[in-house]
């Protein structure tokens, strides 16, 4: 039978798992933002080839609403700016979380080697 881990190691492992879950959620949100940014860039590229007086329709809920090119471009550029800001924020948070996970992983491995010095192979990997 496997030995039960000391409470302080269990607490650190729980913290490690929480940080890992937090990183996973952050990466999912970041991916969603990056996908939306790519879509906005494609739409802006398509709009750039249209005449200024071109008729444009945008989806609002379940409706197609007539709009002008300038206002649609402004809305898209505003949204793009907001998403880019969020993306930069998420990149910083990701970096911080990865560093915390790395530090915690080293701490847990150190604790495990203290409790199980003969094991040699005991440790966790991110």
Swiss-Prot record:
PANTHER family: PREFOLDIN SUBUNIT 6 (PTHR21431:SF0). Its main location: cytoplasm. The gene is pfdB. CDD domains: Prefoldin_beta_GimC. GO terms for biological process: chaperone-mediated protein complex assembly; protein folding. Molecular chaperone capable of stabilizing a range of proteins. Seems to fulfill an ATP-independent, HSP70-like function in archaeal de novo protein folding. Gene3D superfamilies: 1.10.287.370. Pfam families: Prefoldin_2. It is found in: Cytoplasm. Heterohexamer of two alpha and four beta subunits. This is Prefoldin subunit beta. One of its GO terms (cellular component) is prefoldin complex. Belongs to the prefoldin subunit beta family. One of its GO terms (molecular function) is protein-folding chaperone binding. It comes from the Archaea. InterPro entries: PFD_beta-like, PfdB, Prefoldin. Keywords: Chaperone, Cytoplasm. Coiled coil: none annotated.
